[in-house]
């Protein structure tokens, strides 16, 4: 059919393929858009052109535009709006354009989940749900799910004679718990939801175990997987033998081996003529392979030792390959493999029914709570859009409404989403209106059950001329990256990707072509940095082994030093906004990694090089000391009878006990809970430790009561305040980060309380489940990712982004194979597979289905990882740097040389399929580059024609592991110092340190004066010292602490504490009437009940002195003018330094703070009254003598009070009085005199 593409204007900047994508119509369109090909711009332009064409009679609300993320949807809507406004600016009278601008906010431009939500909100009655439902977050959904699942299992256990269920439990769980069954049901539920009809998929899962009518394994639906695997491995064995024969044929090669090797090869080649219709024939053919003993070389000196060893090594590899085929596929008889599946069928049937029950119960529970989760949206939308297996009336209405449906990132859709899109698009193939954009090479979300085969099927059936089921348009030109980056990517992936292994051919249509030209330079050549670890043992290492940790450290230091070198050398970067080169900045650099396990090492390495660093890490939050301590404390508040959390809290800075003290507590009660021992120790011991424990127990009881009365956030904040733990961690190294983590804990508790769950117990349980499942939350961020920092993120997080310089790290980290080697495997095509467990004999056998699906999942994982690597390499705009460690470069390069003689561009299938890490692919690909040939001086390397610029640098770990050398040097220096000998090395910072030591600060006088002082402190500086004075003038607005310092607790109250108690009572006494003794005693009882005053403080208060005050002229005045009285008035006041210190001549001001006990504020004047508890009677000869001392002591204080209050209020301080409780003396202070 004709594409009806209008001619491209000569002035157009669009490529021919981009123009086709913008203009194509009349059929479904698939745009295969390579990385950096401008797909978003094409998509937006297509939409805008359609909308501004008034002859098309298209409104924006007649388009459905689906994006992958909310951010993408917002950006899409913004770009369309901007385009419409520009068009309206050129044609301001257009009613059509005005209408489009007005309709834009009502247009369906969103994620598919949001579109489904829109359908449900509008047609809720079709799905039979409450329209007032609330959409919940995954956290709340998981908590409801766990409750429902536990309830279901408990119900099943309670059913009498439920033999099928009990057999299932015995078959799939351990002896101690049913956690495995719990997890299996949950996994199956999630997996089934990726299918349009989950129940149908679960039922089909059971049918794969129906083998009654099957007589041979070759009849099983998944036999093609088995055949493919055997063929691949036989071919690999053949290649091993061919390599061995090549070495035997070399000059000085082990020629006597040739006859044996050729006989081996004949046997292997004969397997290519196998009868694949008979499993018995296959088994016999494989088992009959006979590798004869290789002959002994008589004169070994006549042969090259390397050739001899290589020939032996390759033959042994071939023997091992054939042995593995026999072990994996033919270890049991055919009849046993088939009978195992039949025996498992009842368990699988029970499991299927159990998952269906759970799904129904889970949905019912959410309905009762009036909530839905994200997984419900797609399936409820499907329920509304489907009528049986046909489009419902609602779906038909959408088909009429949407004149075109456009979907971005189509390669990441699943079967449910595909069905929804099909139901709202035109069902006629001849008039298809679905426009899909994506790149299957960037499909990296299989773990989210994305289905890249949907894209591939259309890619293979759609034709570029539109003659097939739709139109296919390839956008291969890359406008993001320099030629150096594209050449490197193409060179590697031409050798890696084909339909067999990667599910797509990397042909001329798929490879990247240069779109934006820039001058070539060697500085932009792709770099491969290999760090030779020499002694590493890759046979036994895992991701958390000491070897792997050391690899992370070395790699991190390599990268940090490389970044420091680029920054210091002002590496030139082309700035697209400035349209010119500029020196590189930290923000230009990103470090990409498959996982973030090396982030802490990377951060440490960056600190050493003084490089600002931001790691987008979603783990490590619960492991931080401050968060772990708070979680432990909350567990103890919830239930103190938990030994480990209790010990953690006691040992933490909150309580501060040491190991010896913890041991003493346990000795108080050797058996039972540690909390009982704690209580026993408190009661039988008199010590400082016992006092600490007593205080803690009282505080713990208060928190436990608070946890019942108040919400969770109130409890957490109260703990922060009472323990000062938040302030404490702020003073530790990394204090800002630690405080951010504690704030995040408060925020997350607040979010939790907004769910349908409440309370401390549930929150603690929720956190425990997150920890068990490994669902960490990620530490709080104190540095924004948009700042001038080097960023580190996962490759998945980088998808859709671009960076001037990309450093890909962790290339030698092993692929995550946990899912493949899991006890149970799930597959979209074949359902569920696991080992067969004979519960009577307690023997476990691998099933043929399990082996087949394991191979299938392994191939899918390899294809996915290949696409992940493609995404990583295509993020770079200017420069690509690849960093990896190798256990032994000499041995590793020899392994790569095995494929160096290959003449085909594509690497052998087995080499690609058996890769364990990215470096296996990159090494085997780049070994055929001329740069490697020059490095290794190996003539046997068959280099491939390429324009890729590659710089290879081999480093050793000793270049980076300097700590040991530095420690040895420091030990030598220490010996020199002990012997009074000079240190042989002079610090390079000597001159800089000298400058610091000799520096004189110009405003030194200001450093001796505090920027903020209390009036009390000033009074001390300018007046006589008196231990009986009340010096607590700066009062805090918080609950009075009942805890006295430990060294004072056994003594009577100090004069200061007595004064504080008197002031507290004076603040609380009512001025409505003259108080009596009974009034004051009742008030004190109330204050004790509210924990405002302690028993000791009440006992120390002299009630008679309080009563005497109200008999004095000042007291009577306060009672008469009660409405004008203000008590405990705080103030802050800036005062010039020169007014405080006569001999200091600097232009600075000091912040003065204080609290006025009482003041009578009239219309124009203020009277100040300050209470004093100084000892007067019996200490001075008479009041005249005392008054002179008191005026001198308190003159500064009252003068500052008066000046501050007068300045703040704007009213004159008419009088200022001191009232002394001891002796009922009144002293008036002249506030006009100088300081």
UniProtKB/Swiss-Prot annotation:
Naming one, the record's GO cellular component terms include: DNA helicase complex
Record's family? Belongs to the helicase family. AddA subfamily.
Keyword NADP listed: no
Q: Which domain of life is it from?
A: Bacteria
Gene name for this UniProt entry: addA
Identify the residues that the record assigns to the UvrD-like helicase ATP-binding domain, covering every copy: 12-482
Q: Name one GO molecular function term.
A: ATP binding
Note the coiled coil stretches, chain numbering: none
PANTHER family named among the record's database cross-references: ATP-DEPENDENT HELICASE_NUCLEASE SUBUNIT A (PTHR11070:SF48), UVRD / RECB / PCRA DNA HELICASE FAMILY MEMBER (PTHR11070)
Q: How does it assemble?
A: Heterodimer of AddA and AddB/RexB.
Query: What's the stated role of this polypeptide?
Result: The heterodimer acts as both an ATP-dependent DNA helicase and an ATP-dependent, dual-direction single-stranded exonuclease. Recognizes the chi site generating a DNA molecule suitable for the initiation of homologous recombination. The AddA nuclease domain is required for chi fragment generation; this subunit has the helicase and 3' -> 5' nuclease activities.
InterPro entries recorded: AddA, DNA_helicase_UvrD-like_C, DNA_helicase_UvrD/REP, P-loop_NTPase, PDDEXK-like_dom_sf, PDDEXK_AddAB-type, Restrct_endonuc-II-like, UvrD-like_ATP-bd
Binding-site residues for ATP, renumbered to this chain: 33-40
Q: Which cofactor does it need?
A: Mg(2+)
According to its UniProt record, which reaction does this protein catalyse? Couples ATP hydrolysis with the unwinding of duplex DNA by translocating in the 3'-5' direction; ATP + H2O = ADP + phosphate + H(+)
Which PROSITE patterns would you find in this protein's record?
UVRD_HELICASE_ATP_BIND, UVRD_HELICASE_CTER
In its UniProt record, which GO terms are filed under biological process?
double-strand break repair via homologous recombination
The UvrD-like helicase C-terminal domain sits at 509-800
Per UniProt, the keywords (alphabetical) are: ATP-binding, DNA damage, DNA repair, DNA-binding, Exonuclease, Helicase, Hydrolase, Isomerase, Nuclease, Nucleotide-binding
| SUPFAM superfamilies in alphabetical order | P-loop containing nucleoside triphosphate hydrolases (SSF52540), Restriction endonuclease-like (SSF52980)
Q: What is its EC number?
A: 3.1.-.-, 5.6.2.4
- Keyword hit for DNA-binding: yes
**Could you tell me what this protein is called?**
ATP-dependent helicase/nuclease subunit A
Organism name: Listeria monocytogenes serotype 4a (strain HCC23)
């Amino acid at each position: 059919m004709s594409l009806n593409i209008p001619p491209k204007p000569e002035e157009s900047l669009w490529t021919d393929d981009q123009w086709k994508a913008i203009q194509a119509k009349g059929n479904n369109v698939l745009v295969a858009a390579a990385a950096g090909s401008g797909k978003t711009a094409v998509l937006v332009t297509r939409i805008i052109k359609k909308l501004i064409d008034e002859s098309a009679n298209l409104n924006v609300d007649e388009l459905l535009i689906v994006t992958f993320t909310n951010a993408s949807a917002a950006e899409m809507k913004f770009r369309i709006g901007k385009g419409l406004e520009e068009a309206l600016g050129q044609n301001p009278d257009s009613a059509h354009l005005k209408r489009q601008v007005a309709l834009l906010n009502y247009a369906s431009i969103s994620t598919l989940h949001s579109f489904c939500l829109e359908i449900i909100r509008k047609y809720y009655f079709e799905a039979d749900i409450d329209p007032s439902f609330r959409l919940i977050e995954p956290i709340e959904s998981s908590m409801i799910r766990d409750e429902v699942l536990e309830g279901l299992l408990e119900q099943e256990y309670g059913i009498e004679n439920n033999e099928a269920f009990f057999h299932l439990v015995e078959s799939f769980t351990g002896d101690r718990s049913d956690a495995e069954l719990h997890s299996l049901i949950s996994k199956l539920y999630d997996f089934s939801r990726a299918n349009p009809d989950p129940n149908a998929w679960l039922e089909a899962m059971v049918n794969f175990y129906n083998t009654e009518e099957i007589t041979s394994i070759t009849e099983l639906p998944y036999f093609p997987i088995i055949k493919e695997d055997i063929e691949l491995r036989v071919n690999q064995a053949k290649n091993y033998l061919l390599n061995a024969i090549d070495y035997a044929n070399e000059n000085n090669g082990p020629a006597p081996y040739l006859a044996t090797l050729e006989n081996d090869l004949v046997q292997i080649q004969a397997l290519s003529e196998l009868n694949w219709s008979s499993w018995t024939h296959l088994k016999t053919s494989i088992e009959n392979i006979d590798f004869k003993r290789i002959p002994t070389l008589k004169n070994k000196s006549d042969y090259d030792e390397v050739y001899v060893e290589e020939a032996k090594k390759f033959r042994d590899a071939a023997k091992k390959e054939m042995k593995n085929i026999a072990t994996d596929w033919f270890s049991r008889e055919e009849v046993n493999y088939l009978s195992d599946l039949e025996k498992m069928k009842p368990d699988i049937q029970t499991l299927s029914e159990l998952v269906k029950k759970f799904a129904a119960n889970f949905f019912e529970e959410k309905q009762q709570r009036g909530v839905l989760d994200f997984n419900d949206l797609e399936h409820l939308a499907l329920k509304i859009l489907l009528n049986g297996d046909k489009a419902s009336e609602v779906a038909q209405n959408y088909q009429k409404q949407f004149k075109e449906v456009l979907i971005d990132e189509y390669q990441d859709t699943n079967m449910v989403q595909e069905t929804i899109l099909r139901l709202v698009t035109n069902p006629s193939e001849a008039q298809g209106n679905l426009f899909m954009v994506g790149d299957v090479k960037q499909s990296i979300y299989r773990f989210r059950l994305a289905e890249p085969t949907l894209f591939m099927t259309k890619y293979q059936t759609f034709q570029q001329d539109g003659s097939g089921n739709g139109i296919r348009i390839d956008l291969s030109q890359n406008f993001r990256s320099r030629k150096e980056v594209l050449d490197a990517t193409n060179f590697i992936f031409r050798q890696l990707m084909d339909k067999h292994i990667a599910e797509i051919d990397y042909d001329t249509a798929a490879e990247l072509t240069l779109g934006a030209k820039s001058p070539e330079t060697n500085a932009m050549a792709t770099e491969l940095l290999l760090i030779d670890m020499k002694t590493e043992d890759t046979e036994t290492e895992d991701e958390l082994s000491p070897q792997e940790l050391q690899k992370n450290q070395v790699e991190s230091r390599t990268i940090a030093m490389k970044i420091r070198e680029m920054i210091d050398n002002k590496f030139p970067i082309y700035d697209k906004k400035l349209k010119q080169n500029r020196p590189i900045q930290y923000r230009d650099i990103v470090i990409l990694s498959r996982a973030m396990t090396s982030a802490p090492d990377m951060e440490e390495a960056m600190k050493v090089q003084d490089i600002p660093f931001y790691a987008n890490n979603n783990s490590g939050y619960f492991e931080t000391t401050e968060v772990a301590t708070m979680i432990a404390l909350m567990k103890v508040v919830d239930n103190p009878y938990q030994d480990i959390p209790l010990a953690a809290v006691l040992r933490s800075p909150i309580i501060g006990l040491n190991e010896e003290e913890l041991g003493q507590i346990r000795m108080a009660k050797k058996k039972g809970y540690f909390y009982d021992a704690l209580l026993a120790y408190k009661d039988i011991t008199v010590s400082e430790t016992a006092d600490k424990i007593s205080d803690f127990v009282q505080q713990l009881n208060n928190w436990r009561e608070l946890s019942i009365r108040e919400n969770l956030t109130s409890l957490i904040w109260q703990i922060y305040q009472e323990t000062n733990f938040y302030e404490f961690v702020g003073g530790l190294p990394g204090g800002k980060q630690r405080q951010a983590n504690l704030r995040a804990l408060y925020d997350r508790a607040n979010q939790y309380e907004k769910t349908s769950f409440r309370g401390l117990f549930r929150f603690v349980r929720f956190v425990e489940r997150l920890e068990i499942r490994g669902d960490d939350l990620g530490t709080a961020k104190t540095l924004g990712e948009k700042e001038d920092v080097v960023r580190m993120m996962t490759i998945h997080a980088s998808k859709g982004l671009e960076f001037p310089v990309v450093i890909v790290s962790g290339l030698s980290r092993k692929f995550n194979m946990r899912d493949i080697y899991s006890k149970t495997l799930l597959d979209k095509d074949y359902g569920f597979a696991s080992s067969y467990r004979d519960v009577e004999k307690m023997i476990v056998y691998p099933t043929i289905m399990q082996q087949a699906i394991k191979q299938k999942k392994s191939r899918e994982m390899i294809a996915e990882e290949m696409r992940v690597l493609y995404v990583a390499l295509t993020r770079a705009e200017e420069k690509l740097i690849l960093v990896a460690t190798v256990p032994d470069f000499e041995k590793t390069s020899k392994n790569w040389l095995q494929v160096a003689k290959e003449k085909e561009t594509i690497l052998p299938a087995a080499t690609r399929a058996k890769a364990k890490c990215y470096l296996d692919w990159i090494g085997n690909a780049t070994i055929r580059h001329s740069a490697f040939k020059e490095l290794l001086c190996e003539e046997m390397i068959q280099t491939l024609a390429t324009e890729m610029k590659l710089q290879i640098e081999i480093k050793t770990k000793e270049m980076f592991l300097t700590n040991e050398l530095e420690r040895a040097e420091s030990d030598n220096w220490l010996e020199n110092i002990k012997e009074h000998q000079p240190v042989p090395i002079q610090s390079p910072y000597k001159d800089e340190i000298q400058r610091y030591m000799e520096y004189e600060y110009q405003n030194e006088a200001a450093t001796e004066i505090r920027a903020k002082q209390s009036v009390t402190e000033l009074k001390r500086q300018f007046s006589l010292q008196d231990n009986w004075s009340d010096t607590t003038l700066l009062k805090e607005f918080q609950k009075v602490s009942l805890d006295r310092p430990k060294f004072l607790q056994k003594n009577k109250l100090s004069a200061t504490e007595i004064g504080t108690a008197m002031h507290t009572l004076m603040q609380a006494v009512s001025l409505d009437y003259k108080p009596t003794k009974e009034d004051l005693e009742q008030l004190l009882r109330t204050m004790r009940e509210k924990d405002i005053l302690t028993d000791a403080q009440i006992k120390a208060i002299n009630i008679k002195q309080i009563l005497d005050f109200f008999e004095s002229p000042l007291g009577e005045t306060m009672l008469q003018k009660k409405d004008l009285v203000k008590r405990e008035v705080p103030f802050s006041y800036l005062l010039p330094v020169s007014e405080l210190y006569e001999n200091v001549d600097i232009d600075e001001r000091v912040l003065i703070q204080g609290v006025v006990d009482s003041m009578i504020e009239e219309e124009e004047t203020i009277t100040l009254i300050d209470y004093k508890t100084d000892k007067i009677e019996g200490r001075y000869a008479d009041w005249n003598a005392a008054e002179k001392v008191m005026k001198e002591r308190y003159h500064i204080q009252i003068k500052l009070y008066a000046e501050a209050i007068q300045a703040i209020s704007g009213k004159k301080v008419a009088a200022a009085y001191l009232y002394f409780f001891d002796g009922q003396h009144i002293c008036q202070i002249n506030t006009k005199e100088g300081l």
